[in-house]
Amino acid sequence: MSVKRFQIPEGMQDTLMGQCVRVRCVEQQLRTLFSRSGFAEIQTPILEYYRTFDDEVYGFDDHHVWKTFDRQGRVLAVRPDNTIPAVRIAASRLMGEPLPLRLCYIQNVAAFPAEGSSSLCESTQAGVELMGEKSALADAEVIALAIRSLQEAGLKEFQIDLGQVAFFKGFMQEAGLTPAQTETVRRYVEDKNMLALQLYLRECAVPGEVSKRLMKLPQLYGDETVLDEAEALTANSLCREATLNLKQILSALDDYGYGEYISIDLGMVHAVNYYSGMIFRGITGHLGRPLLSGGRYDGLPARYGRAMPATGFGLSINLLMAALISQGETFPAPAAGFVLGVSRQGLRAALDWAEQKRREGINISLQYGASKAELVQMVETGRAEKAACVTEGKVRVWSGEEKAWK
């Protein structure tokens, strides 16, 4: 048989038994957390019309989206993001619902990663969207919920980097850069590529004094005192509003008791271009990339016909699992509660006993034709916790302590 029959496409992965159990456990923990925080779960189709994500202002890079066609030749897209479908629902199916809307989801997304990246093409994302609330308190709630999500999942060491898109935009206004130039600067700032940034600002003929201050942007990283440093760099009103907003969010997060998790990073500017205010990402030393990200996207809902402020975050379950593995967690395949030897002669007695135990919440795995020795071996090798068999019409259970069938 060809080896290719056993291969899966690049960027995809299988999830085996033990990890699958752990994933479902985490998903249920998050569902409970989101629900108890007032968020209602939605599901959106894996296929949407491509135009849903092809917005000229807030859309996705065409090269990152999986596309196909329906029978009428219309272009479809495999969902690369969960925020835009949630906004679509809020602006259509939920148009009559009063604000604020609190929506959550746990579902897959798929997108081509950047060239040379080892990222998965398909991943499961859990997240929340809080629409209709503009205050810094709403932003703080979303960030606190992201932190609580990582805690609930069992991640021990992580931090949240907090930034503000408006601070970067204000600086770009002051520099007088075009949108194309701004995007190039954004990439250099995000990558902390100081040399490339310096050379590019010189190429764009940015005035020396402004360029000197811009060069400090990637270095605005640390505790709350960074905000005072930032305010000393510019008098731009947009920048000042951004730093004030972050101070308000930090104050609220202190009341949540989560201030210790937060670092300020004003050089963080997400590639996803629908963010309009505060942005954040969750990182851990166990991974080379963020496992969650989010922020405020007040301009996005209006593009779909319902103008309203909005904020939210998405957490990659796949990256969370990788982080748990890196911190030493293992996912052994779950052992059966009971292995029950079954033959045709004792089938009725075996089925009645198994059904009773299952009603009691005990897992029963039927083993057809297994001998008593084979059943005992399954227990001794960890494949099952206990063993049972049918003898003379009665179910007998193996006692490991007494080495006998009872």
What are these regions (language model features)?
Residues 1-84, 140, 161:
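TRNA-binding/sensing appendages of the translation machinery
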Residues 19-37, 48-49, 83-96, 102-155, ...:
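Positively charged, Gly/Ser-enriched RNA/tRNA-binding surfaces
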Residues 46-62, 163-173, 268-276, 373-377:
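Beta-rich nucleic-acid/ligand-interaction surfaces
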Residues 54-68, 179-183, 203, 282-285, ...:
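Short, structured secondary-structure boundary patches
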Residues 64-70, 177-199, 206, 258:
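Acidic, His- and aromatic-enriched active-site or binding-groove loops in soluble protein domains
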Residues 145-152, 166-176:
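Hydrophobic mid-domain F-helix/FG-region of cytochrome P450s
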Residues 153-157, 165-168, 181, 195:
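Extended alpha-helical scaffolds
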Residues 157-167, 185, 263-267:
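Short, surface-exposed recognition loops or helix-turn segments adjacent to catalytic cores
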